[in-house]
């Protein structure tokens, strides 16, 4: 099946450069089998989409407004099928606090948290110290790629960390620091097929470092160990958690769940990404390849699935 595929990229998100890098890979691979066109998320998007007349849209967008339900709602108004989760699923996953609230309700292992939205960073700092002590992680509520995230494993300047996170939005999420391996599990969820969880991937980093923006996207800064070096029962638990998180938020097509695993094999779920990175250093495509699915076949399956999906299908929470 040869399709006209509009690949959306860019926009004014803090992750715009990553979006374009992901889109380049998607465009190159889809172009082997389909007629593709790169369309920028800007003021000319409606004109350019209308002129191209796509069968399906692949919104390769990271962070708001491309991954939070805004673009998804726009595409639904245009009546265009698209790859990825719908408006509701995208919005729920992007809001870390709301997502974690839903995760708790279905028994998924998540850390305690504190939502900070007051203007006074010093007042917020005092409340955080009283609740969690000095060892915390501070992150923007609705942002990806670890942008604005500060880890304070030995304590530190909480007020400054709050202000750094607030450069990506007024509301900040604070969690107690949890020491563990960073691992991830991708889900592929196609219409009429059983959900597939790709092999759990462990992220190996230079000593003392974590999977921040630099280590995510600079070639050679991290190693993806597939499968992760964990006991089989822990790998099975993580795969089950990833599936349950995907279903809990009512997601579809694809997602990637991020976890920490302690030295005693305690697992905590951090967040779920509805449009995982597709760059040369990204985790989701690597895990798909480890499962025997080439990048070209992966993106082809996603667009064919999207255009074949029955319209106006509801994906209930916890489905």
Predicted features, each with a name:
Residues 1-9, 49, 92-181, 191:
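Active-site nucleotide/adenylate-binding loops and adjacent lid/helix of ATP-dependent enzymes
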Residues 153-233, 237-240, 266-268:
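Phosphate-binding site of ATP-dependent enzymes
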Residues 1-88, 92-98, 105, 117-127, ...:
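ATP-binding N-terminal substructure of ATP-dependent carboxylate-amine bond-forming enzymes
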Residues 36, 81-82, 110, 136, ...:
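Hydrophobic beta-strand scaffold residues
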Residues 116, 149-154, 187-190, 261-262, ...:
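Short beta-strand-to-turn element immediately C-terminal to the catalytic PLP-Schiff-base lysine
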